[in-house]
């Protein structure tokens, strides 16, 4: 166990410092969205409060940068360093604490798992750049950590801070608040493996009934979370939309395919912990095959085919920018008509995988909350972004069975290989646009 922890920490520290120094050496100037974020932060540091309408997220990251500027300055490297410290030090510590609280255990396996989740490739990559996602993720997880520690006030304050990084975090605040109240009540909440659809509905009704009977008891937590929710409503009334700045390219829509893309994302980055063990079990393989070839599956595939046909959205941002990996997924793969319609059959298998592993330890209420929050986070977004999947991925992993130490090490190795490759591609596989002959373009998540 000591050797495993040593390998994880040495590799983590080595790649963290290598990435920081290499990106600052080869990419010293702001790149892609950093052009807007760094310029805005540096304006704030000069006490110039003019807002760039191209920026559609709140100014939380810039305000933190202004607060820290007397100590670290406001240069490009100083601003990037803020995210690096949070991503490399803050997130592993915070995830370790959350996993310990949820599983009521400490030790090497929890540490392995914390670094495994922190090494999730898109999350790890953006720790080196000045983007809002690292701060957003940190404050949402901090709010959840406080809720698990029964501190509703601290949790609600963290939720408030998270809204200054990304507006859609209001959905996660609702999840966190309900989780807090549920952990302090006794109500009908059967294990998912033993629950029917009617039981899930009864769980929701039972929770609401007990909650309403305990309003006086929960008055302080209700006021804490309620104040944050009211501040969000006030922002909506003032701004007229959830989006700041230019709203034309960020209109809400119904994008059901997002859930399918998330499933692929989830299993691609976690297959050493779940799919390998799943496939090695004869009983689970048999159960999966019988489910896939059932009459119910025919109906599910039919719905998935309709979603693929009518709800595969080719967002202009993705098709116009060949610097992102998703450009090649949509512009090359999804343009192949038969491949688009082959996808629903893979989604069906992933749906059954997902449901089966969720039944291993999840309660009905937790499953309902996670499903609802994931849908509300992803489905309204017409733009597909790997960064949108980060919080759903982490919260689902928190509530699934803790992998073994060996499985964590395999998943960590997968992540770090991908991180090394994507860092190399970002730094050295550059190309030039004819329209900008003096600027190097780079591939990234």
Curated annotation (Swiss-Prot):
It comes from the Eukaryota. It is an enzyme of class 2 (transferase). InterPro entries: Alg10 (IPR016900). One of its GO terms (cellular component) is endoplasmic reticulum. Keywords: Endoplasmic reticulum, Glycoprotein, Glycosyltransferase, Membrane, Transferase, Transmembrane, Transmembrane helix. Glycans are attached at residues 76, 239. The keyword Membrane applies. Pathway: Protein modification; protein glycosylation. GO terms for biological process: dolichol-linked oligosaccharide biosynthetic process; protein N-linked glycosylation. Dol-P-Glc:Glc(2)Man(9)GlcNAc(2)-PP-Dol alpha-1,2-glucosyltransferase that operates in the biosynthetic pathway of dolichol-linked oligosaccharides, the glycan precursors employed in protein asparagine (N)-glycosylation. The assembly of dolichol-linked oligosaccharides begins on the cytosolic side of the endoplasmic reticulum membrane and finishes in its lumen. The sequential addition of sugars to dolichol pyrophosphate produces dolichol-linked oligosaccharides containing fourteen sugars, including two GlcNAcs, nine mannoses and three glucoses. This is Dol-P-Glc:Glc(2)Man(9)GlcNAc(2)-PP-Dol alpha-1,2-glucosyltransferase. It comes from Schizosaccharomyces pombe (strain 972 / ATCC 24843). The lineage of its organism: Eukaryota, Fungi, Dikarya, Ascomycota, Taphrinomycotina.
């Amino acid at each position: 166990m000591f050797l495993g922890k040593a390998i994880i920490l040495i590799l983590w520290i080595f790649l963290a410092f290598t990435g920081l120094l290499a990106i600052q050496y080869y990419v010293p100037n702001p790149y892609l969205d950093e052009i807007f974020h760094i310029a805005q932060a540096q304006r704030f540091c000069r006490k110039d409060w003019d807002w760039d309408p191209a920026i559609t997220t709140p100014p939380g990251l810039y305000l933190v940068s202004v607060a820290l500027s007397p100590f670290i300055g406001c240069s490009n490297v100083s601003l990037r360093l803020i995210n690096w410290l949070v991503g490399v030090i803050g997130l592993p510590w915070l995830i370790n604490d959350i996993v310990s609280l949820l599983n009521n255990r400490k030790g090497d396996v929890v540490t392995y798992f914390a670094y495994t989740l922190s090494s999730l490739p898109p999350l790890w990559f953006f720790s080196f750049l000045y983007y809002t996602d690292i701060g957003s993720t940190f404050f949402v997880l901090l709010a959840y950590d406080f809720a698990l520690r029964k501190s509703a006030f601290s949790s609600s304050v963290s939720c408030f801070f998270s809204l200054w990084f990304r507006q859609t975090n209001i959905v996660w605040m609702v999840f966190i608040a309900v989780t807090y109240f549920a952990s302090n009540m006794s109500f009908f909440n059967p294990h998912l493996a033993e629950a029917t659809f009617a039981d899930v509905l009864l769980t929701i009704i039972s929770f609401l009934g007990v909650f309403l009977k305990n309003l006086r008891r929960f008055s302080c937590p209700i006021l804490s979370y309620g104040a944050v929710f009211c501040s969000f409503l006030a922002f909506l009334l003032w701004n007229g939309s959830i989006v700041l700045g230019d709203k034309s390219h960020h209109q809400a829509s119904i994008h059901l395919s997002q859930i399918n893309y998330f499933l692929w994302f989830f299993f691609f980055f976690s297959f050493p912990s779940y799919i390998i063990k799943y496939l090695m079990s004869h009983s689970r393989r048999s159960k999966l095959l019988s489910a896939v070839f059932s009459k119910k599956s025919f109906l599910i595939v039919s719905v998935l085919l309709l979603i693929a046909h009518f709800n595969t959205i080719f967002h202009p941002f993705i098709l116009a920018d060949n610097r992102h990996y998703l450009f090649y997924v949509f512009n090359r793969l999804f343009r192949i008509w038969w491949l688009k319609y082959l996808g629903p059959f893979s989604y069906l298998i992933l749906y059954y995988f997902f449901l089966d592993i969720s039944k291993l330890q999840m309660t009905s209420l937790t499953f309902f909350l996670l499903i609802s929050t994931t849908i509300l986070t992803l489905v309204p977004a017409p733009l597909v972004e790997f960064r949108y999947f980060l919080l759903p991925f982490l919260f689902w992993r928190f509530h699934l069975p803790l992998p073994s130490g060996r499985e964590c090490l395999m998943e960590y190795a997968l992540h770090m290989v991908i991180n090394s490759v994507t860092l190399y591609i970002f730094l050295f596989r550059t190309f030039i646009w004819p329209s900008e002959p003096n600027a190097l373009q780079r591939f990234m998540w």
